Amino acid sequence: MSELINIKELNERIERESVFVDTLRQELGKVIVGQSHLVDTLLIGLLSNGHILLEGVPGLAKTLAITTLAKAVDANFSRIQFTPDLLPADLIGTLIYSQKSEDFVVRKGPVFANFVLADEINRSPAKVQSALLEAMQERQVTIGDDTYSLPEPFLVLATQNPLEQEGTYPLPEAQVDRFMLKAKISYPKKQEEREIVRMNLSGAGMPKVEKVVTPEDIVKARKVVEDVYMDEKIEKYIIDIIFATREPAEYNLEKLQPLIAYGGSPRASISLAKAARAYAFIRRRGYVIPEDVRAVCHDVLRHRIGLTYEAEAENITTEQIITEILNNVIVP
């Protein structure tokens, strides 16, 4: 019975602690019309200390969303446009000789910010991609002989254009796996697009975004997210979903066996659990339910399942495979 009381107390505490989520949503809603999935994805990444890979055609408010979030959180923001001639030093920084001090001084690169938008990450060679991915993983960079910690919170939002693949350097599977979430951004609805047009044509300009949260609040909120209760049944459900990507036959999904080249790694299980907790938190709840897991499952697994040539020949997507798994794995 004490556990039930604790859950009740925890739920009330999380309801109190997560008030800022609604304030943040309202602030983002001033500028971003629709795109609720994009906003949720940003909040989940921010609260679970994970990075996000976004796929969508140009002009869908990817840059606007992260700049608005940076303003609302009163955080530093930098945008890096990835191009074929970009060097790792352009990203992380370098040593520059100062005639004044007759010594080398450090000039830090744009990666030293709370929010980093890596625009069209697949336009730069592997050495630049790996420099960013190392910074994402280690939360620190080495310039010369010294190592520098990156600011907290640190969130990388990398974008890819799904249409133009000429002259690109696709991210290797091992690198893509470091992104906690991969979200696909879709076009707005008719009514939303009308609102966007009106907002941009009005003489008043874009509404001003107020600072409603501090980076320190986000770091504190992450600690609270870790306290969100996850029952053993939910843990088992998460493990079953990931195992179904590796051994579909064990879950009566024999038809998927020839379509999956490789399934999710243990990192996928960790990411799914963390994302489900963060999703429960932004829904102002102190415990995880199966719907939370299902809500984030596509974004967590989309880039972690490899398709065989047979699947590609039949135009089968990872989305269809994930949906099939969710429809067949027993929900607790």
Residue ranges and their predicted role:
Residues V57, L91, T159:
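P-loop (Walker A) phosphate-binding loop of NTP-binding proteins
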Residues L86-F115:
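Short glycine-rich substrate-engagement loop in P-loop NTPases that contacts/grips substrate
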Residues V105-N114, I143-Q160, L171-M180:
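AAA+/SF3 P-loop NTPase mechanochemical coupling elements
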Residues M1-E9, I14-E15, P248-P332:
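C-terminal engagement/docking regions of AAA+ P-loop ATPases
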Residues R13-S18, V31, T168-Y169, K182-K255, ...:
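Conserved C-terminal "switch" segment of AAA+ ATPases
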Residues A89, P110-Q137, P151, E166-Q175, ...:
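Conserved AAA+/SF3 P-loop NTPase catalytic/coupling segment centered on the Walker-B
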Residues L46-T83:
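Walker A/P-loop
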Residues I14-L60, F243:
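Pre-Walker A (pre-P-loop) alpha-helix and adjacent loop at the N terminus of AAA/AAA+ ATPase modules
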